[in-house]
């Protein structure tokens, strides 16, 4: 097998090795009692936020093929869209500092394009592989492929998913792990636990219920790692297989287990807990945090938490324990909140005892952990802002009802906005095409561009709110109650303040090592004040990860350091590939028989 030196000489790994700022001996080895160590003098205190600070790495390659197959994760058959014929998609894993080269093949026969987003991966100075049709690329046409290549300068647990409209809600996602140090010790790694809500109908069909102004469709079951249960009778419904199973894992007394809870849902923010066990939170969204203990956790769509669970349960009532997850706002919206089983006795196949649902779990609410709980291990101080942040600059979340739209001439469609306009991107002319053109091109208002033409290292602040006076907004909207998991591409952000109720000017920002992450839950009728450093040129999406809301336009795009974008793409030698892919998509799209008045039936993202 080639050595690391061979990889570097061959030019396959873009190597930049900087001082690790390690606090531990250089010979410290990662193990059950030394998880803060990593390798080559790198450890939990090494400043991963600097993309130049990463260990030496190797090349790791994967192939992902997109197809439609019949799946029945909860015992009910339906057509799913999946990677490599499996649901969820295969685990993609690498080590901190590695370069991943992932080739995506679109073998769909239903006419859909596709593109893959590497959720939470910073993609420093490689915006063109962020995988957002209409923003960073044209879709991959059926029968064609695309190579995504990036270096893992962060570590932790995340996921990858289609960013082509609602495609991932039909099953097109999988877990992603970048191995690195941990802020607390553990013995056994149980890997990612993907938690999702599940439907028996196609997501593109269901979306029209929401577009018509009705409440978003309610899922029928909850899945943990692609397994769940749905109450049906095979004798009455041929789609019912009668084969239902919970996700199960085995614990050994006294062992400490690490796992990562990853919310890959379409609609629901989940409250998660394990009967009879506390757990220690050690990471949130690729940001290692000082360990803290709890027994219940809210996980918004797109959020990830690495936790450590010690196998020390009181087994007087039995040796098996339920894993639970329910919707944070209405616990009974899916009647069964049991999503998995932990067994101390592998031979025991009985159902665990079911303790009464505590008020703590039922009324836990929809808030993220408190700012005082999520303390980053690698400390950062937020600098002064360079942008305006008055009330007229707030990012006001709301639903716009019964208005004409670029993609639907019948003015009965309900949309969501994160600014003044619901987003609508054109798959044939993505933002990066405009930014790399030989002449200046205007961004249509429905692409919702927000230009960040500031120097590297300067900070921008933004206030997200779903609780404000309607007199303060340009376009009418309804303050429909909902949790909004807001995700930023290309960065994580600092959370300066967060809460319920309206934001008031007397609220002071937390600037000294505030929590950092890439998805923040704006609670029902609440706000979140975020900030990030301008240092990664590109067109980066900010959007609600509630899929129906994103589909209905709840997004904007930051055009960051626009003058640096084209030189980066040219220097990387990918400008021709980018143009060829768009030309290929246009040829395919123009050859498809699509009615003139229905070219694209949602925001595109």
UniProtKB/Swiss-Prot annotation:
Q: Kindly list every residue the record annotates as glycosylated.
A: 27, 107, 112, 278, 467
Q: Which cofactor does it need?
A: Cu cation
Read off the Pfam families from this record: Cu-oxidase, Cu-oxidase_2, Cu-oxidase_3
The cofactor note reads: Binds 4 Cu cations per monomer.
What EC designation does it have?
1.10.3.-
Q: Would I find Isomerase among this entry's keywords?
A: no
| Function as written in the Swiss-Prot or TrEMBL entry | Dihydrogeodin oxidase; part of the gene cluster that mediates the biosynthesis of geodin, an intermediate in the biosynthesis of other natural products. The pathway begins with the synthesis of atrochrysone thioester by the polyketide synthase (PKS) gedC. The atrochrysone carboxyl ACP thioesterase gedB then breaks the thioester bond and releases the atrochrysone carboxylic acid from gedC. The atrochrysone carboxylic acid is then converted to atrochrysone which is further transformed into emodinanthrone.
Name recorded for this polypeptide: Dihydrogeodin oxidase
**Protein source organism:** Aspergillus terreus (strain NIH 2624 / FGSC A1156)
Gene name, Swiss-Prot/TrEMBL: gedJ
């Amino acid at each position: 097998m080639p050595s690391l030196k061979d990889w570097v000489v061959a030019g396959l790994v873009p190597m930049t090795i900087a001082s690790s700022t390690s606090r531990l001996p250089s010979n410290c080895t990662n193990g059950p009692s030394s998880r803060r160590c990593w390798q080559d003098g790198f450890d939990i205190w090494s400043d991963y936020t600097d993309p130049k600070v990463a260990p030496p790495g190797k090349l790791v390659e994967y192939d992902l093929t997109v197809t439609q197959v019949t799946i029945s994760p909860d015992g009910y058959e339906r057509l799913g869209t999946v990677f490599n014929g499996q649901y969820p998609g295969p685990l993609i894993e690498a080590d901190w500092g590695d370069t991943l080269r992932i080739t995506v093949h679109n073998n769909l026969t239903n006419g859909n394009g596709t593109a893959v987003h590497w959720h939470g991966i910073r993609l420093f100075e490689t915006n063109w592989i962020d995988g957002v049709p209409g923003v960073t690329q044209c879709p991959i046409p059926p029968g064609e492929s695309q190579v995504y290549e990036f270096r893992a300068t962060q570590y932790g647990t995340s996921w990858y998913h289609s960013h082509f409209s609602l495609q991932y809600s039909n099953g097109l996602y999988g877990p992603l792990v970048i191995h690195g140090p941990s802020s607390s010790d553990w013995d056994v790694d149980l890997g990612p636990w993907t938690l999702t809500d599940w439907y028996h109908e196609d997501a593109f069909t269901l979306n029209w219920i929401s577009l018509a102004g009705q409440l978003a469709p309610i899922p029928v079951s909850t899945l943990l790692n692609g397994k769940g249960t749905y109450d049906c009778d095979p004798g009455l419904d041929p789609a019912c297989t009668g084969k239902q199973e919970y996700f199960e894992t085995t614990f050994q007394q006294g062992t400490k287990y690490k796992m990562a809870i990853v919310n890959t849902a379409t609609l629901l923010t989940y409250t998660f807990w394990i009967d009879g066990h506390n757990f220690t939170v050690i990471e949130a969204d690729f940001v290692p945090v000082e360990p803290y203990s709890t027994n219940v956790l809210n996980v918004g769509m797109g959020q990830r938490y690495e936790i450590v669970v010690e196998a020390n349960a009181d087994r007087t009532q039995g040796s098996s324990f339920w894993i639970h997850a329910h919707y944070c706002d209405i616990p009974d919206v899916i009647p069964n909140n049991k999503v998995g089983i932990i067994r101390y006795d592998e031979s025991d196949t009985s159902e665990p005892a079911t303790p009464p649902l505590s008020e703590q779990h039922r009324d836990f609410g929809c808030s993220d952990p408190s700012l005082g709980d999520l303390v980053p291990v690698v400390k950062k101080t937020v600098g002064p802002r360079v942008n305006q942040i008055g009330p007229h600059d707030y990012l006001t979340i709301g639903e716009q009802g019964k208005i004409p739209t670029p993609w639907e001439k019948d003015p009965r469609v309900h949309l969501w906005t994160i600014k003044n306009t619901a987003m609508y991107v054109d798959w044939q002319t993505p933002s990066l095409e405009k930014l790399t053109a030989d002449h200046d091109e205007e961004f249509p208002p429905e692409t919702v561009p927000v230009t960040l033409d500031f120097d590297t290292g300067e900070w921008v602040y933004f206030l997200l709110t779903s609780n404000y006076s309607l007199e303060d907004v340009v376009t009418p909207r309804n303050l429909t109650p909902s949790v909004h998991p807001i995700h930023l591409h290309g960065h994580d952000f600092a959370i300066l303040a967060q809460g319920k109720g309206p934001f008031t000017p007397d609220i002071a920002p937390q600037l000294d090592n505030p929590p950092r992450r890439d998805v923040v839950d704006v609670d029902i009728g609440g706000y979140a004040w975020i900030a990030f450093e301008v240092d990664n040129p590109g067109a980066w999406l900010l959007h609600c990860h509630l899929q129906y809301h994103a589909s209905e336009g709840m997004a904007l795009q930051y055009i960051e350091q626009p003058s640096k974008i084209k030189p980066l793409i040219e220097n990387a030698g990918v400008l021709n590939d980018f143009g060829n892919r768009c030309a290929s998509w246009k040829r395919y799209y123009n050859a498809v028989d699509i009615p003139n008045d229905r070219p694209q039936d949602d925001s595109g993202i």
